[in-house]
Curated annotation (Swiss-Prot):
PANTHER family: ELONGATION OF VERY LONG CHAIN FATTY ACIDS PROTEIN 6, FATTY ACID ACYL TRANSFERASE-RELATED. This is Very long chain fatty acid elongase 6. Its main location: endoplasmic reticulum. It is found in: Endoplasmic reticulum membrane. Keywords: Endoplasmic reticulum, Fatty acid biosynthesis, Fatty acid metabolism, Glycoprotein, Lipid biosynthesis, Lipid metabolism, Membrane, Transferase, Transmembrane, Transmembrane helix. The keyword Glycoprotein applies. It catalyses: a very-long-chain acyl-CoA + malonyl-CoA + H(+) = a very-long-chain 3-oxoacyl-CoA + CO2 + CoA; hexadecanoyl-CoA + malonyl-CoA + H(+) = 3-oxooctadecanoyl-CoA + CO2 + CoA; (9Z)-hexadecenoyl-CoA + malonyl-CoA + H(+) = 3-oxo-(11Z)-octadecenoyl-CoA + CO2 + CoA; dodecanoyl-CoA + malonyl-CoA + H(+) = 3-oxotetradecanoyl-CoA + CO2 + CoA. The reaction is stimulated by the presence of HSD17B12, the enzyme catalyzing the second step of the elongation cycle.
């Protein structure tokens, strides 16, 4: 396995993290993500049915705490994985940053890679607040949560190429997104342009995901040992990112462009 020499400073908890046990656990338990997804789907439909005849819950303080916790986690994750990826990109080049498997077991990043995939299970809790507060639940929201959980657990066990980019981008977008949610939940007035920026960042993330999949597919065929993945993973990843791209573009149009056109016609 290709290990990159890294000179970035490690914190003690990052040094003590046993990535071999983590990878082995995921190889043995990744299919539990299907169980979590099924329970999540059952909660969505069951919870909405139960809340039909009930008054909504405010849950403002718990929502602030929840969003703030995920924001802080994502900020730290983005800083640590971002530092690693930047180091590899500048010292080894683009191909190594995409193909290097040491993101999963190297210093600094190994802890945050595992923390990332595990976090996709508790992040399902976002939907609890939407259900209990009787807010609009769109398809993109729960589809995104389920598929990210399934794909993250499925991919981590194989340590496939491209994972470093996928995780770092997601950390970065979530750092901004959950900070925005925390501010909104706390009652701060946040510019509409900030929300537009977040959605554009998500669209950019999905475009980059498609590009990374193309690069992995291309490099894998020339040297699978140096850029390890498999066609099944690339197929599911490409399908996932393409579907996200379409859905986020549709959401952007409906939420920002479509509303402006309707408001203009009304005037």
């Amino acid at each position: 396995m290709n290990m990159s020499v890294l000179t970035l400073q490690e914190y003690e908890f990052e040094k003590q993290f046993n990535e071999n046990e983590a990878i082995q656990w995921m190889q043995e338990n990744w299919k539990k993500s299907f169980l979590f997804s099924a329970l999540y789907a059952a909660f969505i439909f069951g919870g909405r049915h139960l809340m039909n005849k009930r008054a909504k819950f405010e849950l403002r303080k718990p929502l602030v705490l929840w969003s703030l916790t995920l924001a802080v986690f994502s900020i730290f994750g983005a800083l640590r994985t971002g530092a690693y990826m930047l180091y590899i990109l500048m010292t080894k080049g683009l191909k190594q940053s995409v193909c290097d498997q040491s993101f999963y077991n190297g210093p600094v990043s190994k802890f945050w890679a595992y923390a990332f995939v595990l976090s996709k299970a508790p992040e399902l809790g976002d939907t609890i607040f939407i259900i209990l507060r009787k807010q609009k639940l769109i398809f993109l929201h729960w589809y995104h949560h389920i598929t990210v959980l399934l794909y993250s657990w499925y991919s981590y066990k194989d340590m496939v190429a491209g994972g470093g980019w996928f995780m770092t981008m997601n950390y970065g977008v979530h750092a901004v997104m959950y900070s925005y949610y925390a501010l909104r939940a706390a009652g701060f007035r946040v510019s509409r342009k900030f929300a537009m920026f977040i959605t554009l960042s998500q669209i950019t993330q999905m475009l980059m995901g498609c590009v990374i999949n193309y690069l992995v597919f291309n490099w894998m065929q020339h040297d699978n040992d140096q850029c390890y993945s498999h066609f099944q993973n690339i197929f599911w990843s490409s399908l996932m990112y393409l579907s996200y791209l379409v859905l986020f573009c549709h959401f952007f149009f409906e939420a920002y462009i479509g509303k402006v056109k309707k408001a203009t016609k009304a005037e």
